[in-house]
Curated annotation (Swiss-Prot):
Protein's cellular compartments: Bacterial flagellum basal body
Gene, per the UniProt record: flgE
Annotated GO biological process: bacterial-type flagellum-dependent swarming motility
Record keyword Nucleotide-binding present: no
Protein name per the record: Flagellar hook protein FlgE
Amino acid sequence: MLRSFYNAITGMDVSRFALDVTSDNLANANTVGFKKSRPIFQDMVSQVVVGLNTTTGTVKTTTFGAGAVVDSTQKVWTIGSFKQTEITTDLAIEGKALFILRDVLTNQTYYTRDGRFRINREGYLINPNGLYVQGFKVNPVTGEVTGTQLEDIRVETQIPPKATGEIYFNPPTNLDERAPIIDQTTTPFNPLDSFTYNYRYTLTIYDSLGREVPADIYFVKTGTNQWKVYFLASLKERYINVDWNGDDDKTDIVFLDLFNDQVHIADNGTFSTLPTFASKTLEFDPSTGKLVYIPGGDIVQDTANQKFYLEVDLTPESGPSEINDPNDTESYLNKLGAKLGSETNKIKIYVGEGILQNNVIQNSYITQHAADFVVTMDQDGYARGELIDLYVLSEDGVVVGVYSNGETLPTYRLALAQFTDPEELVKKGSNLYASVKTPTILLPGGSNKIRSAVVEMSNVDIAKEFINLITAQRTYQVTQGR
């Protein structure tokens, strides 16, 4: 049979392969994260005759082709268009990297551009096939990466209550310089007497059980550019079962009505009002109205973080009262009525940060100007919370849980895989790729930014693929002799 017939058959084969590749591209035109492919063909040679023209000194070759053969398919890694979905767990990568997934059944690692993720009932971030998205653990306060190994990204479906440990004065907070001075030698502080203090501010804090405790902060101007601050609590109808001896169970319940009052529980079981109230002294610079730091004074300097704070001890002044609980270890009752983990319960109250100039705190959260009294405060405690939403910070890829108590906690940061040669990736179906080589693990940002509430669509250009389809079909017909 003539050689040309065999050549035509190879042409039919490669054209049919081109039709297969092109039709696959068209079929996945709407597949999220799909990367189109192109067929790579090579020619075949059956015989080469080389001749030398001795007169001219030139070489002549005669080549007998043997048709064409399929070499491979090559994926085209251009970025597809982004489509908004309004689903916060839908993600896209603005770059060439891929998401990392783990199959918990086989421990096999896969890679994908398909960012349609969701949270399962255990709190894991998974893809549509149930594979676990990988990332690095972060500090829930700062959001900085603390993990060194890839982990399954999991968001706590509920967070336990957290007792208030830090309170923050925030700008604007101003103590009116025009306020009258109160002589405490003749008018001692009494929280029930409004004539013994200039201002009062109430802040809700939390105990270790997540109960709200209204904490009252009283401001007393005791001298020119000098104030005293008292930190008390307004408790109402707290009932506790107290074993005064601590050696047997108590059946009688002692009812304590502590509404706007302070009660001291002595070791012998007697009651008395607290004789003194803990206070802190603030001094202000007369020229700037900013706080003055006095070494050895009530304001403590945190040199590591360049912050300044007051430290308030909420433990009763005569020592904590013990409560006998057969189901618990020794417990304590502080001035706020909250259960403590130890005998001391010191809260830091931040009042400024930055550098000192002539002992003046340059970034003073509290000022003393001739302006209206205003206080802005915040604290770090909260009640128990249930997970109600989740979102991913754009660009950085930090996964944040949103809870019913109003808290938003960073948990993980997405990990991305970057391959020097994308052809190392092998298609596994379901928008997944596998690789025998280990990629470079990256954090989102820079050239690989995360986009939230969007997905990357296929990079297939339908018009171009139809042209390729028609070209391959015509070539197929020609090789058939039509």
